[in-house]
Amino acid sequence: MNNHTDALTKQVFTIVSELYAYGIREVVISPGSRSTPLAIAIEAHPKLKSWIHPDERSAAFFAMGLMKGSEKPVAILCTSGSAAANYTPAISESSLSHLPLVVLTSDRPHELRGIGAPQAINQTNMFANYVQYQFDFPIAEKNDNEDIMANTIKFQLQKASQFLYGPHRGPIHLNLPFREPLTPNTEKVEWLTSDTKILPHYQKTTSLNEISAMMKKRKGLIIVGDMQHQDVDQILTFSTIHDMPILADPLSQLRREHHPNVVTTYDLLLRSGLELEADFVIRVGKPVISKKLNQWLKVTEAFQILVQNNDRPDAFPITPHVSYEMSANDFFRQLSEMPTVERKQWLEKWQTVEKHAIVEIKDHLRTATDEAAYVGNVLDKLTKDDAIFVSNSMPIRDVDNLFIDCEAEVFANRGANGIDGVTSTALGMAVHKKITLLIGDLAFYHDMNGLLMSKLNDIQLNIVLLNNDGGGIFSYLPQKNEADAYFERLFGTPTGLNFEHTALLYDFAFDRFDTIEAFKYADLSQFGSHIYEIMTHREDNKQQHLKLYKKLSDIIDVTL
């Protein structure tokens, strides 16, 4: 290249073309000066959809929502300096959730690093603890051989592509230093291509002979966590043929099927004193939400088998006896060919206690006025065509306990399990799905900036906001009794915020509810941008939850 602008243009147009070739269709851009070359290249590409979000932290979570909704990798782009650091929470969540987030950070040229230049921090390897792949690109120089630069880009993107699909999925980081002038030549649009490449396929085949002896034992359990869009029909088929109960996390999507072998009330039963024994456990997918079930897995003597379709198995809460890196469908298809034993009585015990528990839960909800009553009512309003995104902390735990008859899809950020970026993730999903957000007041406050994407892009999202003026989940922890004098200031953390003002700021309709009877008339099927605020009381919420545990303990007369 005989001038800087042409070299820069060739570089960024090639990068964007390669990103498209490997399946990137959406990019979330946080505006800034140093990212000018890539931002213009992305905007000029005829088949890429760009989203503009001025807050990098929220932007990265919005991209995560786009990934969850589209089931495709998504890229994010920011300028240099502290802007990139704001991506860290979402990158850590993507890493633990095995989501292919493509992180594009613009950077100052090498001669401005480490000398106190503005907006210049050390961006190389800055996400090393979380990304699957990282590369610091060379600067486009006017005397560069264009083939060398193009080949470098293509080689690095080819290497990075293995982490966008299959069991190796996870975030990748491409750091791109640019020297001024920063504007590429937009008349060279013919350098932008829309070719696609054969995407890598990664699937190991594994023999299951080493666990054949386990299949001859009677008390077997299948525990299924978040399956991240994986096919699960063979789990149900295997369970039907072999009479094995399935303890299904709501994020597994198996509860939607209303299969007679699927157990939904296990967390409440364990909290209420159920004693559980098993010979072996097949753990599928990511770890479950239920703290009580995870505690049992940690101490049980049952033989544990882990099945996850990624090369970084999530072994929590305890390392299994054997682990398989393969899809659930392939695993259970092979397992079905093994000889087995009669388990009808074992399954019927589970079905009986599940049936009795559901009766008690529904009876309790008829008179309850706490957050569980509202959550149960929200789930009752949703149909099989709906989806719900659930915030961490108390909302996801209530959904875990009360998702019984609902047929909606359930989603949550259960990688790092934080309360940051929840609204932004839900808004990203809302681009591709009709979705309702269930969230607490602290998580909502934490990501109010994210609501701007709804206002700017007319993204419709119904938000059910559970407002107990603080951190309700802490009321259940030992700190409530052990450090009561300090509890409200350090853990209760009331804010006293009036969220009606938030609705006005971001053009959301707003309704506030003080009683469950009034909320029953709320029509969540009328989709728009709407905040349904529910006022609750933390201590009352705790006492009514404890009342439900007591009811269930009275029906437990069997050891499973």
Curated annotation (Swiss-Prot):
Catalytic activity annotation: isochorismate + 2-oxoglutarate + H(+) = 5-enolpyruvoyl-6-hydroxy-2-succinyl-cyclohex-3-ene-1-carboxylate + CO2
Q: Which Pfam families match?
A: TPP_enzyme_M_2, TPP_enzyme_N
Q: Where are the transmembrane segments?
A: none
Keywords for the protein's UniProt record, in alphabetical order: Magnesium, Manganese, Menaquinone biosynthesis, Metal-binding, Thiamine pyrophosphate, Transferase
Residue ranges the record marks as coiled coil: none
Record bears the keyword S-adenosyl-L-methionine: no
GO terms for biological process, alphabetical: menaquinone biosynthetic process
Cofactor remark: Binds 1 thiamine pyrophosphate per subunit.
Entries under InterPro entries matching the protein? DHS-like_NAD/FAD-binding_dom, MenaQ_synth_MenD, MenD_middle, THDP-binding, Thiamin_PyroP_enz_TPP-bd_dom
Q: Which CDD domains match?
A: TPP_PYR_MenD, TPP_SHCHC_synthase
What Enzyme Commission number(s) does the record list for this chain? 2.2.1.9
List, in alphabetical order, the Gene Ontology terms for molecular function in this entry.
Answer: 2-succinyl-5-enolpyruvyl-6-hydroxy-3-cyclohexene-1-carboxylic-acid synthase activity; magnesium ion binding; manganese ion binding; thiamine pyrophosphate binding
Q: In which pathway does it act?
A: Quinol/quinone metabolism; 1,4-dihydroxy-2-naphthoate biosynthesis; 1,4-dihydroxy-2-naphthoate from chorismate: step 2/7; Quinol/quinone metabolism; menaquinone biosynthesis
Which cofactor is recorded for it?
Mg(2+); Mn(2+); thiamine diphosphate
Family of the protein in this entry: Belongs to the TPP enzyme family. MenD subfamily.
- What PANTHER family does this protein's entry cite? 2-SUCCINYL-5-ENOLPYRUVYL-6-HYDROXY-3-CYCLOHEXENE-1-CARBOXYLATE SYNTHASE, PROTEIN PHYLLO, CHLOROPLASTIC
Q: How does it assemble?
A: Homodimer.
What is the stated purpose of this protein? Answer: Catalyzes the thiamine diphosphate-dependent decarboxylation of 2-oxoglutarate and the subsequent addition of the resulting succinic semialdehyde-thiamine pyrophosphate anion to isochorismate to yield 2-succinyl-5-enolpyruvyl-6-hydroxy-3-cyclohexene-1-carboxylate (SEPHCHC).
Write down what this protein is called: 2-succinyl-5-enolpyruvyl-6-hydroxy-3-cyclohexene-1-carboxylate synthase
Q: In which organism is this protein found?
A: Staphylococcus saprophyticus subsp. saprophyticus (strain ATCC 15305 / DSM 20229 / NCIMB 8711 / NCTC 7292 / S-41)
